[in-house]
Amino acid sequence: MTVACKAGAATRYGRSGGRIQPLRGFWAAALMFAFVLGFHAMTTPLQAQTPPLKLVALGDSLTAGYNLPGSAAFPAVLEKLLREKGISVEIANAGVSGDTSQGGLERLDWSVPDGTDGVILELGANDALRGIDPAVAEKALDAIVTRLKARGIPVLLAGMYAPRNLGSDYATRFDGLYPRIAEKHGLILYPFFLDGIAGDRVLNQPDLLHPTAEGVRVIATRILPTVERFLATLRPRS
């Protein structure tokens, strides 16, 4: 009986018996689960390492953040708003107080390094305040855009309006230079950088020329949809 029992056991639990088949299914499922986990572990770090878009805000004191901490300047505030919307981006502050369009052109190469994905160009306010011939400002801004395009760097152009005390002829010539440049180069244009705050005593500092921190937030919020449209046109770096 002992022998019969062993033989029966061999028949019941042998290689063709009922307990080996479930184990095969178990190990197959376990191997598949391990493969999925391994694949996820391999791909997730690669996704996490996708570099953020690198922008440069090239401008004057309106970009630099005159009398404001760096965290309250336009580039930092805009970057924060974009990140809150899930857009991975870094915006370098290349604003220089008092800079004219010609000044921006002269420092262009070191202000906008290689590897930049796009530029927000905000210059011209000081040209108008000094009464510089709009043709001079237009020539400098056109040269900036031309050189950036030659380097494969897209540009979002932020426009400016001339003070009306300079006369209607000057204002017409100055205000029109931004649409002309945008049309010539096929740029996205934000018509007036100070839209929503110009002349507002609450949103500007006592000089009525430079925005307060709250004024900067208004600027960044208003330009945000245009910046998002600009970012959608950028090609990711390889």
Model-derived regions: residue spans:
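Domain-start "cap" segments at the beginnings of catalytic or binding domains
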Residues: 5, 14, 35, 85, ...
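N-terminal helical cap/lid subdomain that shapes the substrate entry/recognition surface
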Residues: 98-102
